[in-house]
Amino acid sequence: MSAATLNDAGISREIVVIGSGFAAQQLVKSLRKLDAEQPIRLITADSGDEYNKPDLSHVVSRGCPAAAMIRLSGSDFAEQQRIALLPHCPVLGIDPARRLVLTAQGEFPYGKLVLATGASAIRPELPGSEHLVTLNSQQEYAASEGAIQQARRILVLGAGLIGCELAMDMASDGREVTLLDLADSPLSALLPATLTQPLQQALRSQGVSLQCGTGLARIDAQPGDGWRVTLSDGRVSSQDLVIAAIGLRPNLALARGAGLAVERGILVDDNLQTSDPHIFALGDCVQWRGQLLPFLQPIVLGANALARTLLGTPTPLSLPPMLVKVKTPRYPLQLAGRTKGEDLAWQCRWNSHGMVAEARDQAGELCGFVVGGDQMSAAFPLLRQLPR
C-alpha cells in the first residue's frame, strides 16, 4: 500500500465496498461526485458489470439477450470512476479488529468498509427446488437464458410485485403462464384484495392463469416433457420452466461472521453505520428503522447521504414518501404510504379504465394511496399530500 493511501496514524484511507450491484455502484458514483481523489476499492464475486435490474421483469417481451443488458463492463466502470476493482473475488471474511477484508486474493485494509451485499431470491424448501429458476440478477438470467427463451409453459411462483410483472410480460409474448400464490390475491403484502381486482382481470385477459390460495408441493423431472409440477391441492401439470418470485432474503453471512448486529437485515442507524463504527451498509441487505427497503429510490438517497458521511460529514438518511410502481402494462399501478392495515378507511373512485384509492387513518388524514390504469397522473399530487 502506498503512503498516499495511509493517514497520519498509518491507517488505510481507502473506502472499501463489498458488492457490485446497484447500491455499490450508486455509492461509488456519489463518492466520486464529492471527491475526485478519495481511494476507493470495490470487491465483488462477479464481473462488476453495470446493468438496469428492473429490466429483468421485461426481458422476454423485449427479446433482450442477457449480454445486451450490460450498460458498462466492470473494468470500464472502474476506469470511468477511477477506482480499484477486484472482480471474481469472493470475500471470505472480515477482521474488524485489524480492519481487513479477507479474500482468496489476499487481505485488504480499509479505513471505512461498506457492505453492499444485496439479497438473494428465496427458494422454498420442497422436493425438486433445485430445478427452480430465479431472476434476481443479470447473471441469473444469463445462466437460464436458453431455458427461458425456449419455454412455452411457465409457472411463476409468487404473485408479488416481481411475479406479477414477469407473468404479464411472458404472457404478452405468447407464453402459457400460470401465476401461483398461497395468498388469496396478488400483491397481498402491499394491497387489500379489493384493490387488486382490476389487475387480476388484466392478468387473466392477458392469458395468465392466476391461481391464488394454493402453493407448490414438488417438482419432478419428466423426460422429454419438462417438469411435472404438483400443487399443494394435489393438482398436477407439465411445465417447461418454474420461476421462484416469492421475495428476497438479505445476504447476512459476512456481517454475522464479523460479529455485526443483524436481524432480518444488517442493523444500521440513521447514518447507515452498523454496530461497528468503521463498517457501514447500504441497499437490499440493510434493516433501517425496522424496515427492509428493496427499492431503488431509498438506495439512491442512501448512497448520497452515506457518501457525505464517509467523507467526513455525518448525514442522516431521510426518506420522503416514495412511489412503488408495479410495471404491468395492461393495468399498471402506483402506490405510496400505508396501503395495508385493518385500521385504514379507503375512499375509492373507479372508472372502466382506472382507479384512485385513498387510505385514511382514524383521524381522517391521508396516509396512503393507490392509483391504477389510466389514473397515473393522480399519483404525484397525492404523493405531495402524504405526511413526511
Kindly give the residue locations of the regions a language model identified.
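Rossmann-like dinucleotide-binding cores of NAD(P)H-dependent redox enzymes
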Residues: 70, 162, 166-217, 317-325, ...
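Short hydrophobic core segments
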Residues: 17-18, 108-118, 239-247, 303
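Beta1-alpha1 glycine-rich phosphate/pyrophosphate-binding loop at the start
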Residues: 3-83, 169-190
